Amino acid sequence: MVPGEVHMSDTPSGPHPIIPRTIRLAAIPILLCWLGFTVFVSVAVPPLEAIGETRAVAVAPDDAQSMRAMRRAGKVFNEFDSNSIAMVVLESDQPLGEKAHRYYDHLVDTLVLDQSHIQHIQDFWRDPLTAAGAVSADGKAAYVQLYLAGNMGEALANESVEAVRKIVANSTPPEGIRTYVTGPAALFADQIAAGDRSMKLITGLTFAVITVLLLLVYRSIATTLLILPMVFIGLGATRGTIAFLGYHGMVGLSTFVVNILTALAIAAGTDYAIFLVGRYQEARHIGQNREASFYTMYRGTANVILGSGLTIAGATYCLSFARLTLFHTMGPPLAIGMLVSVAAALTLAPAIIAIAGRFGLLDPKRRLKTRGWRRVGTAVVRWPGPILATSVALALVGLLALPGYRPGYNDRYYLRAGTPVNRGYAAADRHFGPARMNPEMLLVESDQDMRNPAGMLVIDKIAKEVLHVSGVERVQAITRPQGVPLEHASIPFQISMMGATQTMSLPYMRERMADMLTMSDEMLVAINSMEQMLDLVQQLNDVTHEMAATTREIKATTSELRDHLADIDDFVRPLRSYFYWEHHCFDIPLCSATRSLFDTLDGVDTLTDQLRALTDDMNKMEALTPQFLALLPPMITTMKTMRTMMLTMRSTISGVQDQMADMQDHATAMGQAFDTAKSGDSFYLPPEAFDNAEFQQGMKLFLSPNGKAVRFVISHESDPASTEGIDRIEAIRAATKDAIKATPLQGAKIYIGGTAATYQDIRDGTKYDILIVGIAAVCLVFIVMLMITQSLIASLVIVGTVLLSLGTAFGLSVLIWQHFVGLQVHWTIVAMSVIVLLAVGSDYNLLLVSRFKEEVGAGLKTGIIRAMAGTGAVVTSAGLVFAFTMASMAVSELRVIGQVGTTIGLGLLFDTLVVRSFMTPSIAALLGRWFWWPNMIHSRPTVPEAHTRQGARRIQPHLHRG
């Protein structure tokens, strides 16, 4: 940075070093080479912003738990292999109707065709089982979830978002339907777009600020116009180099890299130009000629610029030790960019000064003054204690705000409300919960097939346990696809449904009970008939007995008649034979009649035989009729008993039916209560449910093809990208573990991905990264300070004051942004601001301490005064330029960039105006010679008094007017 003091009363003599001599002699070729190099890297590859879009890197590392969870879910479901989620939201002022649904179906069918950008579509609205879960309660909005190619933040993911937006833009929604593309992936894509759009504005504003500051400092248009090309060319070379490396895949980029690299290149280039011009003008002011002034300038500034640049480059390279991809990829491009800026400051800027010096364009226009800073130095050495206490008190303003730091993770709040993604979020917020567009995915994978009633019981148990976690709004699973338990899936309801058939058959049963009364009446009629029959059978029995007796008498009479006729037949047989022998008997009437008489006599014999058979039958009938008569009384008694029993049974069943009806009413009420309450208690899914076509379709959404993995979609009640939302992830994990204890799924693998899970990995990774990167950067800065100052205590003071300045700056940023503006400080700010402030802040302190060391020969206190007088103006100017340059980033559309710039700007202002001006000098004054330990420094002057007075007269500020 600012050079050490040299004896400038005499023009340096002897051979000049080869590097400055070569630069002075070849100034024009060097300028042309830098111009050519800048033009080449600018036209050989696209602009840095375009390369940043194509080489954008993911936010979270591939080995993060959330990344592994999303990849695993995509693998077991054969759906996707990234963590990029986007939402397409449909909104209307009226409830969505059939036209909206047809448009939605057509849009989804069109999205399915783009398989290079869209890996999977979770289409809830089309499936009747899950449709209600994708539509808002007022029916005026619906959404579909897309899994895109590429991880969030990567170029492919951003390209996929643009592809989806193009499809949506080319669709023709019905009148009154508005369609938005939102979600985490769209949010990252819009961040990059916002950062790139703001880059030109930031750059233009930065150069405007620098121009104004240079004009105020030098009061010379010529000097300002000569410094600006140094910065412009150096900036172009730096950006072009990183763009070239990024284009060929040598470094990763992000919108943060592009913005911070540009700001650092402008600020550092301007600072180095101020140091060079200031040293050149100082040499010219004390009477050296232009050539000697050039060599004095280079000899006094080259080592400081090189040390400063290497410190910043080394500190920024420490970001490569981070695990988070966002930080890890920032290290190499920022470090390489700073090396290019340093190279330009050590070659290009001196070449321009050499060319301009030949025409006297950089000669000082007026006498330089140091009285103001000399008075500051005098006050510091006179009252070091009170000044140090006051400085610490000022630092406490920021330090006391640090405990209230609440990092912000939701990038939505760091973009303007009018960005496409925020319009989509706003539309979703009007109809859904605040976290519906940022869901979590819980995956439970086991070695058990869960496509059975037992598996469903465990799945619903997990869903209930997760739902009971504080802050969880709803859980979607196969047992609750719409976020509430399946309808009619409780044991009480199924019991009530079992009795429903009885309720339906109750009227029929009552009709049959009425039939039983009819049957009883009919049985009574039958009984009466049988009693009459008994009386008739009794009479029939008597008649039968008489008929049997008469038949036996007739048989006896007939037998006697046959015997007498037989006697007659025997007597007239010869005569009888004549009638049978006569051939013409039938022609003779008397013969024929007589023959018929004899045939009649033969019939008496037949009649006798038949009467004998009839007599046998009558005897049997006479025997059976009493038996039949004996059967009728028991039958009548039995029928009377049956009738009595039927009437009793009818009365009993009627009472039971009334009781069953009452019981069924209670069961139905209980089932309806469980169904209405949707509590999920007593959940049970019968086996026949698995044959339902809609349920089978739902299983494809929530269960893997082999049935051994189940996923849950979890929505938070509040912002998932918040400290509370992030803390909720471990609670969800613990609830899941508790739910599967002592179940067939015990020991199953649990994965959680999504917004809060991703930011949990980021938060945990940030803690590690800040620790590692911070320690590495502090150690690097301390080593550089130790090598340059060769004093352990001085190096510790430099590092300590820088750390104090860093804490104060961050606290002030928290105070301004979080408490005044009302926007939490983004989680990336700590790491990005720490590195820059460590490097730049230590450089300013190093400059001051180096000047202390040069002037210590005049005595400790006198040396401090002279160092303050000699460096105060130039360091203040450089610090203000750097601070305002970084603060110019506050105009960015991306408020994260604005917070980075304001945090670094506040730190540099505090470091320049308080730490370097009061705190470090007061500490040096208080410690005295111990400040230089282990070096031996005398408190008294060690140079002749004349030389001391001459040195006092030589002290002039390097650039600024007092």
UniProtKB/Swiss-Prot annotation:
Family stated for the protein in its record: Belongs to the resistance-nodulation-cell division (RND) (TC 2.A.6) family. MmpL subfamily.
Pfam family, one: MMPL
First and last residue of the signal peptide: none
Keywords: Cell membrane, Membrane, Transmembrane, Transmembrane helix, Transport
Cell compartment(s), UniProt: Cell membrane
Bilayer topology annotation: Multi-pass membrane protein
Source species, domain of life: Bacteria
GO-annotated biological processes: symbiont-mediated evasion of host immune response
Transmembrane segments: 25-45, 201-223, 225-247, 256-276, 302-322, 335-355, 383-403, 768-788, 796-816, 820-840, 867-887, 895-915
Name of the molecule in the record: Probable transport protein MmpL9
GO cellular component annotations of the record: extracellular region; peptidoglycan-based cell wall; plasma membrane
